Amino acid sequence: MRLLCAAFRARFGPVGGAKHRLENGCSFNKRMVMAKKRVVVLYGGRADEHSISCISTAGVLGAMDTERFEPIPVGITKDGKWIINGEDPRGWNLDGGELPTVKITPESRPVMLDPSRGQDGFFIGEPSHINSADSGFGTSFVSMSDPEMHHVLTSLGHVDAVLPVLHGPYGEDGTVQGLLEMMGVPYVGCGVFASAACMDKHYTKVVLDAAGIPTAPGVTVDARNFTAADVLAEIEDAGLTYPLFVKPSRAGSSFGVTKVEKADDRETQQDRLAAAIATAGEHDWKVLVEQGIDGREIECAVLCPKAGDEPEASWPGEIVLDHQNDDQFYDFDSKYMDASASHVEVPANLPVSVLEDVRDVARRAFKAVDGAGLSRVDTFVTPDGTVMVNEINTMPGFTPISMYPKAWDATGVSYTELITRLIEGVLR
């Protein structure tokens, strides 16, 4: 894979070049800063969805209008290190091989933050700093009020906005959003509350139920402390019918999801539930047990580049499974690893009146959680036309086979225009 583009080599020069040292706190290359808006693109992260974030970023960087924006890809390793000059994410794809990850290369340099400096608070250390916890660089935070820092760090320059292409916990859950809020750096996407609430499916349901938006019936279980007998009794008290879907409350990309069918006896049923809860519990101690819905899974892309504007909804689409003999749900492999497993249909093959109902529910759900920027609202449409919200993804996938960009393309907004509108929305 190619190492990060020549623009970064030209910008930062040889590692350790004295001419690039920070002097008097001033950033460098002001002429380039004036020419284009500089956008840090965050990718990778500590979540299970790390590799999907990498693939999404490849799509985003490939679609970004480089006449308007200067993308600055900043990777986050699985153990949380922020780096620049690693492998170029533009070369990553879904080819059925090994999923990509953010790795430290000989040319990688750590990215560190001084929150007090806001949009000028991004700094770069030397390669030797990445793993040197003993020398004070084991953290991603620094204080440039320390004179010693001026001799060892380089300014990344003024950052106009951040595009966090991060999926799952430690990225899509309000944590990174809170950091950027604290720094005063404009960023694309939902704010702290919406990100946190939509990452936690239990609280998504709480908010939507309060807004009068239907969701799938279910119960919430603490995987750290439960008995299968108690869970089964709770399921029966709630009147849930089979099949059930057991899933982590705070995970995405179908990680840890198990379909549980009706058993012939209680003991077998309890065993199945216990196994499913244990699987989900590997990803989150909070586990949802939801009733399977007899309906079609219809997804709608919502766009609201500037917080407070009226959200727009795409034509809803449907993921159609092509392996008709498989009695499976749309799992991780179907989503990302097997391009032949499914295809996207936009608009979904439904009456226009039903499609408009889905769009209306998607907009209402987005507003109920105080959404901003973008989200993909996943719904169930039952045979009688009822629209139920399954979940809200505040940073939906941007892979080549992802619904979000495909839905907007079918609605008349190209991939490049989509990225442009999202970034320019936070710069207004």
From Swiss-Prot:
Cofactor note: Binds 2 magnesium or manganese ions per subunit.
Pfam families membership: Dala_Dala_lig_C, Dala_Dala_lig_N
Molecular function as annotated in GO: ATP binding; D-alanine-D-alanine ligase activity; metal ion binding
Domain ATP-grasp: 205-424
HAMAP family: Dala_Dala_lig
Family in the record: Belongs to the D-alanine--D-alanine ligase family.
Name listed for the protein in its UniProt record: D-alanine--D-alanine ligase
